[in-house]
């Protein structure tokens, strides 16, 4: 009930200012992870405002990918994200923001700051640092109850190929702060995501995505499996 009230409040915030808001976007995505033999679905609603604010809410559902003691995550989760764009000039933008993640395990907060550079009209770069702090404790490798907090660095490249296609690459490095390990048996892990969007109409954009997720696969009690993610989705301007 408490979570529902929070999400209702965020939705009200996102859609209560039509005079200054841009078009909202609905993103529907499905995916499959080869190492974990897992399926995912995601629904995401986002909206930006002309005064610099941006907000989103998304819901993720998995099958049994996390049905393993070595994987500290939940099968279903909801997250809310808010950021504010500060224009430094015509090319550079700083975006401080906050991501709040709700799951059956508890709540995670992810304050971040992102720096974006519009090199040209068609080519854009970005870097972001985020600190994921968990409001709940989990057993660490020493058997103690601690917080599995994470430092996260992201890099972004977006290239507008032509009026029909856009290509994007996101690279991510995770580093655990305390005595925990990823499924690759290390304190750090990497991810690389490659996305190709097709602008079918001004309001409808289907896309495909391939991610290499390091050796983070978990399946039937085994971990350290090579993990590939294949996704397909479509976004709609509402």
UniProtKB/Swiss-Prot annotation:
SUPFAM superfamilies: Porins. GO terms for molecular function: porin activity. The keyword Membrane applies. It is found in: Cell outer membrane. It catalyses: N-acetylneuraminate(in) = N-acetylneuraminate(out). Residues 1-23 form the signal peptide. It is a multi-pass membrane protein. Gene3D superfamilies: monomeric porin ompg (2.40.160.40). One of its GO terms (biological process) is oligosaccharide transport. Keywords: Cell outer membrane, Ion transport, Membrane, Porin, Signal, Sugar transport, Transmembrane, Transmembrane beta strand, Transport. Monomer. Outer membrane channel protein allowing the entry of N-acetylneuraminic acid (Neu5Ac, the most abundant sialic acid on host cell surfaces) into the bacteria. NanC proteins form high-conductance channels which are open at low membrane potentials and which have a weak anion selectivity. This is N-acetylneuraminic acid outer membrane channel protein NanC. It comes from Escherichia coli O6:H1 (strain CFT073 / ATCC 700928 / UPEC). The lineage of its organism: Bacteria, Pseudomonadati, Pseudomonadota, Gammaproteobacteria, Enterobacterales. The gene is nanC.
């Amino acid at each position: 009930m408490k979570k529902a009230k929070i999400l209702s409040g965020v939705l009200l915030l996102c859609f209560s200012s039509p005079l200054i808001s841009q078009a909202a976007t609905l993103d529907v995505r499905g995916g499959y992870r080869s190492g974990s033999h897992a399926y995912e679905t995601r629904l995401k609603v986002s909206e930006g405002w002309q005064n610099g604010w941006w907000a989103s809410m998304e819901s993720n559902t998995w099958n049994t990918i996390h049905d393993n003691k070595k994987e500290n995550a939940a099968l279903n989760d909801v997250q809310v994200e808010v950021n504010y764009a500060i224009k430094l000039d015509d090319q550079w933008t700083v975006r401080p923001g906050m991501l709040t993640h709700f799951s059956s395990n508890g709540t995670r907060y992810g304050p971040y700051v992102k720096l974006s550079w519009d090199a040209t009209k068609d080519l854009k770069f970005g870097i972001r640092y985020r600190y994921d702090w968990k409001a709940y404790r989990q057993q660490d490798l020493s058997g103690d109850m601690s917080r599995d907090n994470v430092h996260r660095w992201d890099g972004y490249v977006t290239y507008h190929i032509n009026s029909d296609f856009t290509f994007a690459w996101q690279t991510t490095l995770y580093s655990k702060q305390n005595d925990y390990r990823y499924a690759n048996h290390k304190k750090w892990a990497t991810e690389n995501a490659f996305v190709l969007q097709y602008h079918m109409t001004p309001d409808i954009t289907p896309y495909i995505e391939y991610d290499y997720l390091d050796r983070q696969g978990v399946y039937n009690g085994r971990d350290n499996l090579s993990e590939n993610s294949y996704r397909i989705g479509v976004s709609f301007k509402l």
